[in-house]
């Protein structure tokens, strides 16, 4: 799968693009089931909310066959190769649960801030890919993006939170700069399960809490170019992978076929 000229232009201008329903119902059902399984694991890679509800599970492609296939799926790999015209590797793989009633806030930040300061990533030549496992709606803690903020490059952040977060004045300025004819400088991409969102590593984003009965599980795959590999990671390997082997995509039907074999085995 490749991006259209319009999608490429949108990504360049706005810092993100949305690809509706990239994965089938059968593929999403498999991934949602696998997500429930991995979120029950008691291991360092699985972070929890204060309540004990799952918050984020990292490196799940290392202990789930289904997510291993997703990490190498051509519908995710090829668009990023197209953007950079280079081989890519997995820098980070995670599942954000945003559990119903429990999913807490993620403050305003740029991901490249952490990649550069904590991992020694030279340039923002990495892309985040979000795969919606549940329907993402305006009400259940969707990701909030500030369009065009990737053009601000690397903005100084603070360490007042487990991310390099941005202060209110900076966020306000970026939002005002991004305001369009509607007078709104923040967007919340929504979509059905199986939708994919690509966004630039310097795009400023956040997420409000989820206080609804509707969960909002999203898989995030960060792909970095091999030539831009990290040089001095201070974080655990499951937070910033140090296997820089170029990804070899699986067959396009690999995930669907795995879902089919699982259904047959369970019958």
Describe the residue ranges of each PLM region.
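Extracellular structured ligand-interaction cores
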Residues: 92, 124-130, 140, 186, ...
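Short edge-strand/loop segments of extracellular domains
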Residues: 98-100, 146-153, 222-228
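A short secondary-structure junction signal
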Residues: 104-108, 117-119, 139-145, 154-158, ...
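Non-heme Fe(II)-dependent double-stranded beta-helix
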Residues: 1-14, 19-121, 234, 239-254
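Double-stranded beta-helix
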Residues: 139-204
